[in-house]
């Protein structure tokens, strides 16, 4: 990949980083609204690709994107999926050992994480 994520179009990111050939219905409109207005409301059923609304923009932004999720199992699944796509992500929740938390803190300070999932 010659261009970094900040220089790629959303369609290129979708293909090259997420492995999809096209957006699902409604995704393009929500991403456009986020880009133009900084906020959007999208109501979609389970499995409709809502995670893309914060995962794709996270690749364009400097720093880390914080994702609050009450479901640890869902966080684990999403992080595993991101890792398969070579996207740096981690989670903070009460199940982690102190050494794991310290490692995540080091990665945050180093600026290597793009997404950090936290449980309330």
Regions from the PLM with identified roles:
Residues 22-120:
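Conserved P-loop/Walker A NTP-binding site and adjacent catalytic elements of P-loop NTPases
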